[in-house]
From Swiss-Prot:
Reactions listed under catalytic activity: L-cysteine + L-glutamate + ATP = gamma-L-glutamyl-L-cysteine + ADP + phosphate + H(+)
Enzyme nomenclature, EC number: 6.3.2.2
GO molecular function: ATP binding; glutamate-cysteine ligase activity
InterPro entries: GCL_type2/YbdK_subfam, GCS2, Gln_synth/guanido_kin_cat_dom, YbdK
Protein name: Putative glutamate--cysteine ligase 2
Pfam families reported in the protein's UniProt record: GCS2
Function: ATP-dependent carboxylate-amine ligase which exhibits weak glutamate--cysteine ligase activity.
Length: 371
């Protein structure tokens, strides 16, 4: 399949995708309720989409094309409320979080779709281990070349996005020590990591065709990059976030990405360069391991500071962009979270320490999602 042309889209519009956990109310383990929930929701009126994922223990909700933070918040809230209402008759719980705290990957089944069955056949057990839950944010770009500029410019802020959304401290009943253990599952795939440093669509098309001719990939879907262009939508897709525990935080993070994109496209505070990636993997690891307490190394100045402080250092520059986009409340929430340094991973650990029961932790995560 050749690379399709980059579709024209309205700059700085955005969309949000959230992968959610489906658990039974008996022991709060993952359960394959997606087909039942989708049947219960058939005919429900809402913007956006609700659809199955790689495992029937997951479900994805996504907004339409959003122009504002408030629109995204309203669309996701409506879908959340519809799903929560439908879940009651199914004795089903729905939760955010990047990983389920104690599910066993070997118990999972793969959804019966050609794409997911292909992934299972190609990647073996990695497909079942990929029962993790992420937030993806699409940002509309004014042109194909601008999409690549934005992809690499916003790459500097990947540690922000990871740390702000981190909600996966537990894997198979064990505290991993990570704030976001989910990304370790993604890293096992061969085409994961960061996109190649290319700044023109002609160069990117040549790269894509070369990779396709090797047989390594067939389409853009085979790239599991942290940020990837989506030519069929005219967007870039930021893919590093765990699914937060609440719709509110998911929308705050999406709005933060949108305002950063506006700042980078209009102000051009720097030009991306290959050397930006010298510290990329280190910064990303710090965000995964330590969350907002992790260290951020500036790629040019080589100074070090906590990720939370680096977030706070950019907030003032984002104020006019947040104001123009109608997302000042989201910026205030992001600033407050960075000041507190107590994200969702911290909340999950605190609940687990008090309850001494991961089942109870999942139950309370379901309550958080429904609130």
């Amino acid at each position: 399949m050749s690379l399709e042309p980059f579709k024209q889209s309205e700059a700085l519009t955005f969309g949000v995708e959230l992968e959610l956990q489906l658990v039974n109310r008996h022991d709060y383990d993952l359960a394959p309720f997606a087909p039942d929930l989708l049947r219960a929701l058939k005919g429900a009126e809402h913007a956006g989409d609700i659809k199955p994922e790689i495992s029937p223990s997951m479900i994805e909700i996504s907004t339409g094309i959003c122009h504002s933070y408030q629109q995204a918040l309203e669309e996701l809230t409506v879908m959340r409320d519809l799903m929560v209402a439908a879940s009651r008759s199914l004795n089903l719980g729905i939760a955010g979080g990047g990983t389920h705290p104690f599910q066993q990957w070997s118990d999972r089944t793969i959804s019966d779709s050609p794409r997911y069955q292909y992934i299972s056949e190609l990647y073996g057990y990695l497909a079942k281990q990929f029962t993790v839950f992420g937030q993806h944010v699409h940002i509309g770009c004014p042109s194909a070349d601008e999409s690549l500029f934005l992809l690499h410019a916003i790459g500097r802020y990947v540690p922000h996005f990871v740390a702000l959304a981190a909600s996966s401290p537990y894997v198979q009943g064990v505290d991993t020590g990570f704030a976001s253990a989910r990304l370790n599952s993604v890293a096992a795939f061969p085409m994961s990591g960061r996109a190649p440093f290319l700044l023109t669509w002609d160069a990117f098309t040549a790269y894509f065709e070369k990779m396709r001719n090797t047989g390594v990939i067939e389409s853009m879907k085979d790239f599991y990059w942290d940020i990837r262009p989506k030519p069929e939508f005219g967007t870039i897709e930021v893919r590093v976030m765990d699914t937060p525990l609440t719709v509110q935080r998911a929308c705050d993070i999406a709005a933060y990405i949108q305002m950063l994109a506006r700042y980078l496209l209009l102000s051009r505070p720097f030009m991306p360069q290959e050397d930006d990636y010298l510290v990329y993997t280190f910064n990303r690891f710090q965000a995964c391991r330590f969350g907002l307490e992790g260290e951020y190394v500036h790629p040019n100045e080589l100074t070090r500071m906590p990720i939370a402080d680096h977030i706070l250092s950019i907030c003032d520059a984002l104020v006019p962009h947040a104001e123009a986009l109608g997302s000042l409340p989201a910026l205030a929430n992001i600033r407050a979270l960075a000041e507190r340094r107590d994200g969702d991973a911290h909340w999950l650990r605190q609940v687990d320490a008090e309850a001494r029961s991961q089942r109870e932790t999942v139950r309370k995560a379901c309550d958080q999602w429904a609130a």
